[in-house]
Amino acid sequence: MRAFKFILFVAIFAMGLNGAEVSLRAKVSQMIMVGFNGASTKDAAFRAMLSDAGYERFGGVMLLGRNVTNKTQLKASIKAIKEKSPKIFIAIDEEGGNVSRMKDKSFDGPYPSAYEVASTLDIKSAYDLYSKMAINLKECGINLNFAPVVDLHDENSPIIAAKQRAFSEYASKVVIYADAFMDAFKEQGILTTLKHFPGHGSSKEDSHKNKSEVTLSKDALLPYKDAISTGRAQIIMVGHLFVKGIDEDNPATLSKKIITDLLRNELKFNGVVISDDMLMKGVGDEALAQKVVKFINAGGDILLFSEFKINNQRTADLVTQIIIDAVNEKKISKE
């Protein structure tokens, strides 16, 4: 079983704390990111999230469309969160196009999709566009973006190509536009996330709703190889994808063959591995506890949940206890 990389978690999510001073529960909580309802402190759900943030019951929050109306509102919301938890990660899905939380004009938006950018803009213009996007996110207080998508554009894909989320069908073109995206965000001090490893483009299904099978290809891996070799890859999001011929029993999110053998050992990625939303249908029908343990033992670092509660229980509390129990039962080993 894979040992916890607690030093990594503390370094990323709890900078400034002495490792000896951080309890097991505190360390485990930093492995969890949650979504929440509400867009201001007037909302009860938002206040509940703020309370938990103050007690550091999770390492980060993810912002969805339900949390964003305009720039003034978003700044105020994030200010309230950071007053409770100054070192928390504030993440957003801002790809542009269909997957955008910054459609309001106050964000200098809306921003075009990845496919539109790569089809109409040269690299310099793309960099300038993504710089504007990054500046707007930074001004609001966001420090992590779940983008860029580095999947390949395949016309048969209902979730990637149909929504124009990929830059191109050509891996070399994906690489140069993804580099422009990552470089623009790095300049503003915002972390980026390559997704959806090992490549969602060939899937004929939407992993939000159904089991999604993909065929692994050298081209699909090229954007990851390039970003890892150049040092641009900071965080990689693993998709709920069943990879034919490698692990047809587990989605990539729960697969040691994909995360440890392929991503860690073969591609030499030493950064942070985050799951796609663990509440998506594509992750399978196993019990939540089994999924959580499998993800960690497969080599994953951070668990992402889009909802603040699961069956009326706070997600962070539930998942933290699952992990602690697994450690105590030696289902997960601890360094």
PLM region spans:
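Preference for extracellular/luminal or secreted protein segments
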Residues: G19-S51, N265-E266, D285-E335
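Enzymes and membrane/adaptor proteins characterized by extended Gly/Ser/Thr/Asp/Glu-rich
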Residues: G54-V174, G201-E213, G239-A252, D277-I323
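Alpha-helix-loop-beta-strand connector modules within alpha/beta enzyme cores
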Residues: I81-I90, E169-G189, A252-V273
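Short, well-ordered coil/turn segments that N-cap beta-strands
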Residues: V28-Q30, R57-G59, P86-I90, I142-N143, ...
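Sec-dependent N-terminal signal peptides
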Residues: F4-A14
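Aromatic-lined glycan-binding groove of carbohydrate-active enzymes
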Residues: L191, L221-I236, L241
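A general structural motif
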Residues: G38-A45, L216-A227, A252-I259, V283-L288
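Structured alpha-helical segments in the cores of large, soluble enzyme domains
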Residues: A48-D52, M182-F185, L221-S229, I258-E266
